[in-house]
């Protein structure tokens, strides 16, 4: 390679790096403005962190190409012009972030590297990272005089009149009368309960609701009319004293204790020595997070000794003596590598996104549902796109954003398959429906497999020990084709022992569970058949209304529509199901194999004793040994709806032994609590 060629190549590479920097700078600036100025962030904190880290990594790798207007050296953006602007006496810095135990160890190593041998391995103070708006409060001789937002870290906005309306902020501090200037910094936030009330009132009045408590708190403080802020449920949590701290107080933890004595609210905090102690406290707070009265998104770790804090100093944006240990992200960015189509038991085609594996909320996610073709069109998502994936608690991960400006060249729009990817039958998308379906029905192996899996599931025939893996294996080996074949597996016992190395004990347990499942209920049997549109509650209503299977199978569409929760479309689906010859053959084969149930005493569903009531079950039913599913079936037979969570609309809570938080919540809401002995009398089982 000649020198000219090498120079040209280097120049081209530099231009490519600069172009990427400019794109990231534009993105970070855009979201800085949305977050710090408008208080309407359009991406999650984690997505913002990832954009910023990408820019920092480029700048560290190519320092000579760092752009002069890079936002990595500043905290935020310009304050709003509608409030007067105030210069901070001491810059209000932001915090750096760490995300795992290795980051934590590295942070502590950096602290030690800047300390003398005698001062190394200092004690740390850990407190909650509150998710609100950072505010500085200033007092002159104990009198509150000014409240200012962080703004860009150097200049903030004067929100004094709004701050005065926050109930837990002391406006006069007698114990600070001898302190010329006292500056207290902290976070203004909106507790979860207040946030819910505020949004509920907004909905009732037809007003705009807030996306989250942080936006609600920030939006309330930015109101030009203090009366609006006064009407909002805001709270202030102090986290530092930046001017006026008595000389005798030399620790951050002691400063927080002093603030409490002055009348400020502070969050819980802990003093620790080692990285493992930090990690243990951090992990315990992840578990407690949902039960807190306010939102937190991590923990703040600070060197506890204030003298050492001064020695360690700060970078342009953040202190060296503190960092934010963020909780596992619930929204992260990754690459959508491909889109595949899966076929469900009713023939529904569901697009599934195959992701570059990524940690979301502490769990590795590699697949994400895209729901249906309409959702793909709405998102305008393509294979190769950068996407944001969200997962909260036990919620199934989903794509919440597609980064179209990061889309690589050469991608193509997703098209709906014309034929089933499994059986090659035509795919239809009925007019007015969002779900495309394979027309292969029982000809389609995917639908056959899903029907088998549904049939043995816990809420259907509840055949313990016959899991999805074995069912698919039996299906692929031709041993099981229809659900009725399950009850003839005993005829293949020897073959099953050698198949997939099941073993005699596993086969014996499986066959016993199959035999025990023959005694079932009509509602379970109806649900197990997998009729499209018939869920658990509808199956219960059908059983209660018709009493036995022959009456249901012979019902007209009009008769079916008379059943609660059964509309015209569902009635047609049920009617057609029982007129398909292969379905009749399977039902007959099941009954011939010994599947049976007790006839249900017919009742008009609107005359049931618990009709219109919503019940919740918690704890263990020890006296009867009854499972929650069986208790649920009894309650449904009496007309009740059974929910998984307690609310003000809950009619009663069935509480067994070791009832937990649901019982506490029910008692606080005044919900009727029914103990097991009363429940057994109610269902005639005592």
UniProtKB/Swiss-Prot annotation:
<dbReference type="Pfam" id="PF03120">
    <property type="entry name" value="DNA_ligase_OB"/>
</dbReference>
<feature type="binding site">
    <location>
        <position position="127"/>
    </location>
    <ligand>
        <name>NAD(+)</name>
    </ligand>
</feature>
<comment type="similarity">
    <text>Belongs to the NAD-dependent DNA ligase family. LigA subfamily.</text>
</comment>
<dbReference type="InterPro" id="IPR004150">
    <property type="entry name" value="NAD_DNA_ligase_OB"/>
</dbReference>
<dbReference type="Pfam" id="PF22745">
    <property type="entry name" value="Nlig-Ia"/>
</dbReference>
<keyword id="KW-0464">Manganese</keyword>
<keyword id="KW-0235">DNA replication</keyword>
<keyword id="KW-0436">Ligase</keyword>
<keyword id="KW-0227">DNA damage</keyword>
<dbReference type="GO" id="GO:0003911">
    <property type="term" value="F:DNA ligase (NAD+) activity"/>
</dbReference>
<feature type="domain" description="BRCT">
    <location>
        <begin position="605"/>
        <end position="686"/>
    </location>
</feature>
<dbReference type="Pfam" id="PF03119">
    <property type="entry name" value="DNA_ligase_ZBD"/>
</dbReference>
<feature type="binding site">
    <location>
        <position position="150"/>
    </location>
    <ligand>
        <name>NAD(+)</name>
    </ligand>
</feature>
<dbReference type="GO" id="GO:0046872">
    <property type="term" value="F:metal ion binding"/>
</dbReference>
<dbReference type="InterPro" id="IPR003583">
    <property type="entry name" value="Hlx-hairpin-Hlx_DNA-bd_motif"/>
</dbReference>
<dbReference type="GO" id="GO:0003677">
    <property type="term" value="F:DNA binding"/>
</dbReference>
<feature type="binding site">
    <location>
        <position position="444"/>
    </location>
    <ligand>
        <name>Zn(2+)</name>
    </ligand>
</feature>
<dbReference type="InterPro" id="IPR010994">
    <property type="entry name" value="RuvA_2-like"/>
</dbReference>
<dbReference type="InterPro" id="IPR013840">
    <property type="entry name" value="DNAligase_N"/>
</dbReference>
<keyword id="KW-0862">Zinc</keyword>
<comment type="function">
    <text>DNA ligase that catalyzes the formation of phosphodiester linkages between 5'-phosphoryl and 3'-hydroxyl groups in double-stranded DNA using NAD as a coenzyme and as the energy source for the reaction. It is essential for DNA replication and repair of damaged DNA.</text>
</comment>
<dbReference type="GO" id="GO:0006260">
    <property type="term" value="P:DNA replication"/>
</dbReference>
<protein>
    <recommendedName>
        <fullName>DNA ligase</fullName>
        <ecNumber>6.5.1.2</ecNumber>
    </recommendedName>
</protein>
<feature type="binding site">
    <location>
        <position position="187"/>
    </location>
    <ligand>
        <name>NAD(+)</name>
    </ligand>
</feature>
<dbReference type="Pfam" id="PF12826">
    <property type="entry name" value="HHH_2"/>
</dbReference>
<dbReference type="InterPro" id="IPR036420">
    <property type="entry name" value="BRCT_dom_sf"/>
</dbReference>
<dbReference type="InterPro" id="IPR041663">
    <property type="entry name" value="DisA/LigA_HHH"/>
</dbReference>
<feature type="binding site">
    <location>
        <position position="326"/>
    </location>
    <ligand>
        <name>NAD(+)</name>
    </ligand>
</feature>
<dbReference type="InterPro" id="IPR012340">
    <property type="entry name" value="NA-bd_OB-fold"/>
</dbReference>
<dbReference type="InterPro" id="IPR001357">
    <property type="entry name" value="BRCT_dom"/>
</dbReference>
<dbReference type="Pfam" id="PF00533">
    <property type="entry name" value="BRCT"/>
</dbReference>
<dbReference type="InterPro" id="IPR033136">
    <property type="entry name" value="DNA_ligase_CS"/>
</dbReference>
<feature type="binding site">
    <location>
        <begin position="94"/>
        <end position="95"/>
    </location>
    <ligand>
        <name>NAD(+)</name>
    </ligand>
</feature>
<dbReference type="InterPro" id="IPR013839">
    <property type="entry name" value="DNAligase_adenylation"/>
</dbReference>
<dbReference type="Pfam" id="PF01653">
    <property type="entry name" value="DNA_ligase_aden"/>
</dbReference>
<feature type="binding site">
    <location>
        <position position="302"/>
    </location>
    <ligand>
        <name>NAD(+)</name>
    </ligand>
</feature>
<dbReference type="GO" id="GO:0005829">
    <property type="term" value="C:cytosol"/>
</dbReference>
<feature type="binding site">
    <location>
        <position position="423"/>
    </location>
    <ligand>
        <name>Zn(2+)</name>
    </ligand>
</feature>
<keyword id="KW-0234">DNA repair</keyword>
<feature type="active site" description="N6-AMP-lysine intermediate">
    <location>
        <position position="129"/>
    </location>
</feature>
<feature type="binding site">
    <location>
        <position position="420"/>
    </location>
    <ligand>
        <name>Zn(2+)</name>
    </ligand>
</feature>
<feature type="binding site">
    <location>
        <position position="438"/>
    </location>
    <ligand>
        <name>Zn(2+)</name>
    </ligand>
</feature>
């Amino acid at each position: 390679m000649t020198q000219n060629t090498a120079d040209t190549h280097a120049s081209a590479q530099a231009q490519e790096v600069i172009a990427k920097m400019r794109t990231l700078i534009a993105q970070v600036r855009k979201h800085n403005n949305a977050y710090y100025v408008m208080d309407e962030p359009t991406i999650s904190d984690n997505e913002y962190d990832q954009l910023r880290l990408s820019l920092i990594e480029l700048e560290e790798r190519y320092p000579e190409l760092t752009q002069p207007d890079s936002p990595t050296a500043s905290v935020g953006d310009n304050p709003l012009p509608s409030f007067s602007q105030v210069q901070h006496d001491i810059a209000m810095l932001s915090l750096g972030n760490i995300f795992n135990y290795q980051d934590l160890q590295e942070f502590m190593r950096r602290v030690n590297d800047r300390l003398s041998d005698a001062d190394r391995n200092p004690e740390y103070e850990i407190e909650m990272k509150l998710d609100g708006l950072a505010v500085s409060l200033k007092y002159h001789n104990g009198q509150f005089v000014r409240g200012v937002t962080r703004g860009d870290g150097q200049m903030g906005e004067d929100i004094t009149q709004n701050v005065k309306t926050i109930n837990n902020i002391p406006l006069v501090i007698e114990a600070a009368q001898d302190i010329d200037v006292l500056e207290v910094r902290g976070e203004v936030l909106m507790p979860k309960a207040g946030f819910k009330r505020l949004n509920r009132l907004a909905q009732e009045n037809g007003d705009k609701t807030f996306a989250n408590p942080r936006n609600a708190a920030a939006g309330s403080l930015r109101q030009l009319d203090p009366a609006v802020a006064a009407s909002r449920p805001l709270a202030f949590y102090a986290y530092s004293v930046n001017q006026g701290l008595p000389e005798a107080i030399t620790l951050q933890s002691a400063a927080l204790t002093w603030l409490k004595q002055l009348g400020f609210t502070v969050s819980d905090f802990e003093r620790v020595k080692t990285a493992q102690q930090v990690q243990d406290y951090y992990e315990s707070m992840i578990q407690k997070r949902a039960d807190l009265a306010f939102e937190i998104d991590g923990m703040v770790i600070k060197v506890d000794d204030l003298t050492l804090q001064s020695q360690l100093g700060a970078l342009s944006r953040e202190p060296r003596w503190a960092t934010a240990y963020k909780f596992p992200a619930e929204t992260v960015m990754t690459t959508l590598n491909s889109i595949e189509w899966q076929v469900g038991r009713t023939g529904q085609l569901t697009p599934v996104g195959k992701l570059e594996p990524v940690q979301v909320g502490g769990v590795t996610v590699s697949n994400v549902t895209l729901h249906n073709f309409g959702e793909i069109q709405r998102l305008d998502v393509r294979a190769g796109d950068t996407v944001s994936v969200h997962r909260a608690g036990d919620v199934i991960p989903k794509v919440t954003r597609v980064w179209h400006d990061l889309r690589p060249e050469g991608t193509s729009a997703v098209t709906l398959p014309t034929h089933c990817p499994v059986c090659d039958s035509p795919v239809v998308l009925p007019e007015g429906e969002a779900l495309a379906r394979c027309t292969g029905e029982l000809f389609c192996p995917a639908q056959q497999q899903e029907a088998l899996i549904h049939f043995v599931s816990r809420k259907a025939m509840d055949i313990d020990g016959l899991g999805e893996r074995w069912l698919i294996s039996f299906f692929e080996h031709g041993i099981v084709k229809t659900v009725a074949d399950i009850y003839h597996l005993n005829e293949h016992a020897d073959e099953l022992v050698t198949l997939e190395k099941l073993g005699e004990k596993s086969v014996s347990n499986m066959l016993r569970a199959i035999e025990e499942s023959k005694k079932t209920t009509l509602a379970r049997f109806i649900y197990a058949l997998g009729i499209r549109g018939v869920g658990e509650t509808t199956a219960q209503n059908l059983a209660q209304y018709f009493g036995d299977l022959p009456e249901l199978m012979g019902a007209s569409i009009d008769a079916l529509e008379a059943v609660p929760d059964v509309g015209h479309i569902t009635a047609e689906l049920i009617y057609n199901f029982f007129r398909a010859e292969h379905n009749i053959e399977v039902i007959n084969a099941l009954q011939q194999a010994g599947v049976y149930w007790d006839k249900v005493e017919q009742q008009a569903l609107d005359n049931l004793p618990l009709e219109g009531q919503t019940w919740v079950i918690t704890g263990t039913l020890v006296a009867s040994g009854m499972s929650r599913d069986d208790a649920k079936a009894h309650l449904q037979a009496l007309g009740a709806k059974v929910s998984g969570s307690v609310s003000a609309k809950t009619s009663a809570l069935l509480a067994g032994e070791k009832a937990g938080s649901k019982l506490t919540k029910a008692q606080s809401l005044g919900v009727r609590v029914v103990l097991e002995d009363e429940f057994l009398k109610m269902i005639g089982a005592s």
